[in-house]
């Protein structure tokens, strides 16, 4: 072992120097093979022995299409049997062309002139100063994790700053688009958009934008392929991951994408690596390229899907005019220069397609976005148990997809099917319904079978307790397993669920975000993302359904663990205790009741 130590030390030093020394993947691999062939040999043996035989990193698509999991951020190759290759017209060009060099030059300023950049900067500074005056509260340590304490003096502030800087890398890795220098972190405004937001803010105290851009000039023509190009700044592997995200958008909407790297005419999306994760919003109204910047830390399918959504016309979820009914902005905890990132839209200028507010949207900020310190909550969900739902970047939510289809694909199918459980006619396959997670079948009439485990199903309840658990409980479940239960009470009764025993589901404790989770949908609309439970403490309160049904989803995307067990039963409405209810319908009913009383 003593003889091996110097050799291993030199080998690993050479290995990391090669990897970190440049962006050219092919050259790096060639150098590694020629100079570190013993290490490569050992790595091949180890990887061959340890690779899962069932392809565990390929997850089940809840929407019925084969695609690589949005959780997997390290895809090197894709099986032809797993990914359809005909959905996107793509011609890969491995050398930088003259056209790509033109795109690279334009991408440095996102296609804007120096005058336009100065105008945007001017209005953003105005917005920042206005919001700082509107919310001058000093920092207070409220609604933080249990280990957080109030900041008492300069010494403790210094400690917090040190901790914050130490955690920056982890924060950027989690939701890198929130750490950008642009509007709301990752939105590159043009001069007209910046002016409109500022004027609206001065007049109304909020911005005039919406979850989806209203202007027809900025919408893409859904009857033609959306042209996209690469400017040559991404590796072949990075290009393929980006195309997988486009392929996912293709599969779940009526939109088609076509790659053309060899011309500069026509509106198009150009993928570049110029500055973090960032995008313009919607199509350029004058036919110029619409740039999407994806740095190496952004090459994750969930983050790419988020940025492509901006390019197609999406703004952020928590900026909707009805957001105060669902989240509370902790202005006192927001970084002083970032308060303009939490502006709200006008209710008279909204295009949300009648799609309700979605805690699980891939466009939603996480709980601690733009905090002055990382332990400070900047967004609190008004129903506490949704706190770990917001901010996910794993996959597009059902309502994200539904809104995109409402905007672009409403005329794709001649007939609308009588879909159940909140589903709607699939614009890509008009003979079937697109179903919420947990349901399947032509009309969403069946509960989705377990994936990777024999679990889930429909359970008819009585007044006696029944038990449901994660696979293999009390032993560990495995990564990639999924279970869906539909709990059904007799007519006129409700479903009660309570957790007990050991509970362990992987989460980002510091960021208050579930990675693996048990999700409970207990409202009247199963299309809405439910409350997600995770981390390492057993939830205490009982959960009641708003109707006779409750949907329970177990999803293990990242790693195995102990899991959960829960008791379920039916209860008459006369036994119903309002304090145990956690339901969007009950919450909205209370909001309406208070609104009537106040008026």
Swiss-Prot record:
The active site is at 307. The gene is dpy-31. Residues 23-211 form a propeptide. It comes from Brugia malayi (Filarial nematode worm). InterPro entries: Astacin-like_dom, CUB_dom, EGF-like_dom, MetalloPept_cat_dom_sf, Metallopeptidase_nem, Peptidase_M12A, Peptidase_Metallo, Sperma_CUB_dom_sf. This is Zinc metalloproteinase dpy-31. PANTHER family: DISCOIDIN, CUB, EGF, LAMININ , AND ZINC METALLOPROTEASE DOMAIN CONTAINING, ZINC METALLOPROTEINASE DPY-31. GO terms for cellular component: extracellular region. Keywords: Cleavage on pair of basic residues, Disulfide bond, EGF-like domain, Glycoprotein, Hydrolase, Metal-binding, Metalloprotease, Protease, Secreted, Signal, Zinc, Zymogen. Residues 455-571 form the CUB domain. GO terms for biological process: molting cycle, collagen and cuticulin-based cuticle; proteolysis. Inhibited by marimastat and tripeptide hydroxamic acids. Residues 405-445 form the EGF-like domain. Zn(2+) binds at residues 306, 310, 316.
